[in-house]
């Protein structure tokens, strides 16, 4: 997971990407965290757990960009789900590499 201090500077290192920005509301409710992420990624609203999120995120191979950048706006010290979402992204990336796609997961404490 990448820590972003300056969004524009960070994004300038990529040429062919699709950006998803997630305002993380819940730092302690897993279902709410997953629901927020699913909503931003345009995934079905019935996704309630990590396995379901993995299954649905595999559909991101359809995104017309090589890099799928997800920036989570949250406090990394307080968000207990960052290691879980990192594992989810790692698993999904194994699938996406067959389609020349990759998810880049980043975290930022503020929208700059």
Protein language model regions, located:
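P-loop NTPase catalytic core of nucleic-acid-dependent motor ATPases
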Residues: 50-59
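N-terminal intrinsically disordered, low-complexity segments enriched in P/E/S/T
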Residues: 1-45, 60-112
